[in-house]
Amino acid sequence: MKLFVLAAIIAAVSSDRFSSQSQSTGGQTYPSPWQVGKQYRYEVTSRTLAHLQEGPSSGSAFKAQFTIRVKSPGRLQAKLENPQHGNFNEQLPDPRELPVDLKYQPTPNIDKVFEIEIDGGRIVSLDFPTSVPVPQENLIKGLISALQLDTSAHRVIHDSQNNYDREQQQGLFRKMETDVTGDCETLYTVSPVASEWRRELPKFANEQDPVEVTKSTNYGHCHHRVAYHFGVPVGAEWTGTAHKTQEQQLIGRATYSRILTGKEGPIYKAETTSTVHVHPHLYGKQKAEVYSHVHMELISVDQDSGAEWPRAGAMRPAQSILYSLSTKQMTKHYESSSSSSSSESHEFNFPEQHEHPHQSNQRSRRSYMRSKLVTVHKVLKKRNSESSSGSSSSSADSSSTYINDDIPDIDEPAYAALYMSPQPHADKKQNAMNAQKILQDIAQQLQNPNNMPKSDFLSKFNILVRLIASMSTEQLSQTSRSIETAKTSNNIIKSDMWMIFRDGVTQAGTLPAFKQIQSWIENKKIQEEEAAQVVVALPRTLRYPTKQIMTQFFNFARSPAVKDQMFLNSSALMAATKLINLGQVNNYTAHSYYPTHMYGRLTHKHDAFVLEEILPTLAADLKATVEYKDSTKAQVYIQAIGNLGHREILKVFAPYLEGKVEISTYLRTHIVKNLKTLAKLRDRHVRAVLFSILRNTAEPYPVRVAAIQSIFISHPTGEMMQAMAEMTHNDPSVEVRAVLKSAILSAAELQHPRNFYLSRTAQAARYLVTNEEFGYQHSFKFIDDSYDEDNDIGTFVISHIGSEDSLLPKDFKIVTNSKGGAWERNTIEASFSSAERFLDYLRDSVFAPHPKFDRAHKYSAEKIAKLLNIKNDEEEPLEASFYVDFMNNQRLFSFSESDLQQLSQYISEYMKKVESGAEKHYTKVYNQDQVSIMFPVASGMPFIFKYKEPAVIHFQSKLKGKFSFPSKDNKYYEANMIKDVQFTYAINIDGNVGFMDTLSNQYSSVGVVNKLQFNIPFKFGIEIKSGLIKFRVEPLHPDQDQTLVHYSVWPYSASQKKDSLVAISQDPATKIVERRSKVFSVDSKYGQSTHAVIYAQGYTYSSDWRNFGAKFTSRDYFTNLASLLTQEDIALTHFNLKHLCKQSQSKALTITAYYDEYYNQQNSGILTDATDRNDLSPNSETRRAEMVKLVSAGINKARVRVVDLSASFEGSQDQNYVLTGTWGDSPVDSKVQGMLFAGTKSATQGNQQINAVFATTKPEIHSLSFSKPLQSDLRAPFGMHFKYGQSGEIRVSGSFDRTKKYTTELENHPLAKQCSQQTTLNNFYQDSCHKAIVMAHAPDHVEFSVSFQDMSPQYRNFSYHTYRLYEYLGYWYTEANPLKLTQNGKMDFKIDFSYFDRTYTVDIASPSGEARMRDMPIATMAPGALSFYQPLKAYELVANYFTGHQYQPYCSIDGTRIHTFSNRSYEYPLSRSWHVVMQDESTQRGNWHELAILSRRQQRDQQEIYISYKSESGQDLEIEIQPASGDSAYQVKVTTNTKKITDDDLTMYWDDVKEQPFLQYHTHKDGVLVINIEDDRIRAIYDGQRFVVFTQDYRNSTRGICGRMSGEQRDDYLTPEGLVDKPELYAAAYSLNEENSDPKTQELKALATQQAYYPEYKYTSILRSDPTWQEESQSCGEDQWQSETVYKSRSYDKHKGACEVRQQVQFYENHGDICITTSRVPSCQSHCRAGDYKIQHVQVTCKSKLDHDFRMYKEQIKKGQNPEVSGIPSVKQFKVPVTCQP
């Protein structure tokens, strides 16, 4: 009886729901196209297909007859009759049409009677029999959507352009309308139809003219959409049209409907077409298309007097025609349909646009004097600039709370993530079995890399991931237990099975997978490094970061099971905080990266768990580690807090940045760098903080440079950019000036729309930037985004922070951000407190010298330090870190000094392990990027786009070696290692576009797969000895051919069964897209002569290969490399590079490199023509000795360098290639000679060799004078002789000259004029003179003749071929005269350099004619490269050009001026007091040398020098130098513990420990004494009056009048007592009160002590204002009317009384807070009104709505009470009454 009553109630309710429907809206009745008592029969066809721009189409078709019976108003019965369905995958003449011979099959479970509820022409709901599956329901919804015709005003969007005339049946209006694809804005047009409509509707030609109605859907404005997405790149628009500059159109989607209907009905014809366009690889011109078309045409309209069709059993209601994923009914929550268009679309802003100053200013101008009013207890939505730091956001419609499916439970897989089609919510028993089968298959394939591309290893891995993703917790746990046994197996295949499964679980991204990983770590199945690599991938793979998961992950990262494991502890913490940023803090990624359209936002936007739980915990951890001075952990916590990217991290970091908590400069720099995540959100607060830091010149420069590098991420305002441009002129720090210039100039070149504002502001400031040139060692930031409209390769950023103690940077960072990357991807960063000290520490850990010096020096460095009270700088703790974000692994390896000690121990232990043999097996499979987007199309089937970049790294090795460290018995490091390596790296770029045919469960798709694989299967051996390195390589499998490189591109069309376990490429139904003709092909073998055969084979149909050089046009190498892996013209491509081991007779290759130097060589004779060598064997000591003797012939005290390279191919017939070169010169001889030998020794091809000799004579050098070299000719004759074959030879004779023209140009150059002015003041070696002297020794004319004998014909026209090459390149003006010939066998060359024009001209005269190439560009550093100037070498001059003279800096003690190492020049004439030129005392680690150089002038034109030097090898010397008197030589007195080996024109002392000269000195021809200590460690030139010292050591450690050598001129004001401002005080401060010192100098020294002040850092306040100024700014600020919300006060007093102003405490609620005023505010009672208003600034205090006290205060206020509150106040504006009136 109960069941009967319940059934009756349900029937009554159901019938009432239908019968009560009125076909009217707002009192107006609208006709329905369906008339009661009529039966309508339609012919229905539907097709959905996918296709590329060429090739086959893959799809399905459906047809049936559709009958509609109208039994009562608003209620229809409908039925599909004879439904049929077919699939196809074939080439079609028109890719959108169907095959003519398509075979249809009956479609079950869809021909049931169902009911439709309508309101006019609008579909309200449907009732389906429960026997109709949900996929068939969605198909029916797609058909019904095509018939929906609603011209009523229901949900019309208010817009002045809307119009509709019901009488005329014409109009155009926008409204919100629901169909199967979503509830979105729809544009209706109603218009008459052309007279030819009868041809289209022949059956109804006699009816009255129909009306044409068209509908177009705007998917950018929806109240609800049914969609699933994951991993969508930043700025990629797929829901609508990309309008903003920060957006790129990822997917183009459109739905268009056309309906022909009678004025009173019926609908004669209805067509709906959906198109989706997307490039399979995200961006590009050649889009794939998914096309869906529904066609319904009326066959007949008949009277229907028959009985209703009986229901087919129980019915299931569908409340809308939206696409469904289950039978469960969800509830819509969207705003009123009558709201305006501006209020219907709640748009999130992109991070790139968030709070941008340009937009803020525009809004401000529009809203000037227009305050927003709200009553005190209501929330007013603020401008974006007032939102939280994370409110960067997403595309439209995110406010919708409509949920399509429930978020998966912690134990459930993600059903919707697979195909966005209804799934049975139960485990498939075969999942585990199938997973194990695939695991076994691909683990076996991994052992044979040659077949991996063909067997499609990576595609099968993603099938495995799909299977794992479909498992519940229980099933996954069972599967894991069955595979975990393979983890410890010695079997390689089983071990690979475990590692592949482990990575498959990591990539699955489901909640059961996350739970399984936790279980592995807790049960120690994976530990330390292995566990770390798993955990760090989770932020990019976890698809459902709910609050529960994020807090669970964070707590897990801090649990003992994790914190006690090396590598895992830091990695887990960073992974957890990164996930929290992506899933909660960053509103943009929280919406766009995760499937919010399917499940709604996964965490509440205003949930305070980050502020209440996560951040306080991390802040406390950081505070504790700082108190314990644990730098290693502090770096990790700083990075983790920075990862959160919440604005509140500024408060956490403030005490450390402000100096209230003392930390090292390194950690402060680390904090500033880790503000980048917040800066990416364009947060204006962090932008203000960064700008304040970079503007604070009292901050340490590393902190300021880090702020500059981060502020460009936040997109600084135009005013900030202009201020920074001005700073490039006047900032005291060269590092700051350098990085600002490079950042502004590179930002101005950016082209990507996402960088539009940054580029524009930089372009406006670029012309304000200084022209000062900075060295490459200085801080810089370079940004490049190679972009065009259809191809977005990515962004490349390189930056570093310069060092004061090294040319190596303190911080070096490279970032590549791919088109699919949401975060910085492939980031490598190395950071040091001091790179120099770090390297010294590692070096000394292996070899720590402890020299002992028994002899006391007259003025040692130690003694000088005591005399002048020089104290070594207090060194900050040695700290370092390496940050890597690669393979989706974000890793931070931080070090302190104690960690480095452990590191050296670890290295030593590993070396011991290697000596007994070490094996390594590593496999890592991961998805570098993945994007999934799914949504329904017109047919009711889900469109599916999936992009993945699966990659694998497989590494197997065996290493055994022996190491010998320097000792008493052996002074050299030696090593001998043998390593077997099998290394494989493969990556697929796999894009797939299609749809799921839910009727046949067939997945129809098209796509493109790019495959790249590298395979290195070799055995390596390396031997290191003194001066010798020997490298041996041989195939690991000599009996197998090996594919070393594979590259292919496969466009295809496919049709696969759902959940197929077969890779698409291996499915027989898959069809490859091919073209008729190949663009390029290769089939060649190389290396036959060496018997090591390399085979290149392949082809391509892509037109990209017609101009391969076009791929190398970018400014950076990364972009050029990335372009090789992408195709603009997608076409079948296949290339292999193979090593044919079976055909190669050579089974091993040995490469030997030998280098040595010989000093003081004395050999009589002269260098003769080249002759053949008798010894052709590799690494021949005999040949080297012979060549050393020959090349040093005739050179006085020659120094000879020898390089010997050889390559030996070993096999049945050995093949040897040898290259030996020697070079001889001498500091006391002008001759320079060289020899070259190149030979081959082959058993099959015989012996061949080429010999060459070279000789030149250096011109006269004037080291300290600019005028003298100009007074004499600069000429350097040279000659070369080549001998090859039996009688072939080439002779070259010519000279380098300086022309009179160039001499005149030099004399008139501004540089020369500056030098002349300095010379008149007796200053010969200041900056301008140094540069001028170098240029004066540079030749500008080279002329030589080449004569040849028995030259092969192909070389005789060398000049002509060279000329044609230049002409082809087209860079320069070229001329040719084929009539002007030289004699056979001779060529003449003339090269003229114009250094000031930066061009050169080449004239070539040959037997083929004369050619001239004019005005070819030449590098600016050419004079240095060609200059003969000494004592600097050519490469040092070039390096100095690129480093601002800091590679080999110099200091000159000139006549009246001193030029410091850091390029500061100041006036100071030396007195008779000894002055410290340089002083550097040895430290405990890293610097074991001691140096002291003193200088004084006993007379005005005579300078005396004293040098004290002690080396790390235990050698020491003292040198006392006095100027020459009359014709006598310089008086040089040397006291040393080394042995003198020569003592005439070149004096040399020998270091027996290092086996090299310890001291050399000689007097040059120009009368300059040249000193060389420890083989160029210190060089000096001296002419009796002036002294110049060159050295690149002692950076930032030396003290004296030559400065600190830090590269910063501002450092050259620091004396032992502090900073002084006057140059005479600075120099006098380094004078000694010894040996008859000058009284005046001592007076200046005493004055310097009095005036000195110590440098002091003053740290930056972080967003701190005093209360008075803050209040004044609020009340007096110009933007007070527009800057914030204005609240309206009210009185809560319930007792009516006289209308007068009452004082009442006010409250309002804002998001998750309750805010209460700290004082009473004027207000009027509710029965009164205000006579006038004013704006009053009031302090308020806010706390969470969960706060018990504030909830109580709110209730008291509502009762009229006035509670007192306390807390941190902020100032808000209230609109208060001046008077109250009745």
From Swiss-Prot:
One Pfam family matching this protein: Vitellogenin_N
Biased composition (Low complexity): 386-400
Gene: VG
Predominant cellular place of this UniProt entry's protein: secreted
GO cellular component, one term: extracellular region
Superkingdom per UniProt: Eukaryota
Function: Precursor of the egg-yolk proteins that are sources of nutrients during embryonic development.
Segments of this protein annotated with the region Disordered: 333-367, 379-406
Signal peptide as annotated in the record: 1-15
Induction: By ecdysteroid and juvenile hormone.
Protein name: Vitellogenin
Compositionally biased intervals (Basic and acidic residues): 344-358
Cystine pairings recorded for this chain: C1451-C1602
Keyword Oxidoreductase on entry: no
Modifications after synthesis and translation: Glycosylated and phosphorylated.
Tissue note: Detected in oocytes (at protein level). Produced by the fat body, where it is cleaved before being secreted into hemolymph. Sequestered then by a single class of receptor mediated endocytosis in the ovary.
Domain VWFD: 1449-1638
Gene Ontology terms for molecular function: lipid transporter activity; nutrient reservoir activity
Residue positions the entry lists as glycosylated: N569, N587, N1357, N1463, N1596
Organism: Bombyx mori (Silk moth)
Residue ranges constituting the Vitellogenin domain according to the UniProt record: 34-812
Self-association state and partner proteins as the record states: Heterotetramer of two heavy and two light chains.
Subcellular location: Secreted; Cytoplasm; Cytoplasmic granule
